[in-house]
């Protein structure tokens, strides 16, 4: 995996609003989330995100906008997020970091909460 940027291959090509408001409950299967009010807006940078992570954000009544792994900070900030999520994904964080680290550095300057999982967390660590 060394030097492989696989995130670019699996990332969304277009920005989209996550609209699947169904929640998985082991006992019931998918059920509709009855609380329609969205409290926080999270922008998820897609390095290969799993849909279940997006479902969990919905469970917590977050509005979630998913953007490409190469979306620049200026365009992310135009979405007026309350926080930034750096997703999981395949590949070498150093290779993906070549374009991701400058974006994350620009986002950090705006004092927004930024958090990640797996590859996203590794890229955040490289950024800091």
Residues covered by each model-derived region:
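RNA-binding accessory domains that recognize and position tRNA/RNA substrates
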Residues: 1-80, 91-93, 108
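Cysteine-nucleophile active-site neighborhood
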Residues: 78, 82-128
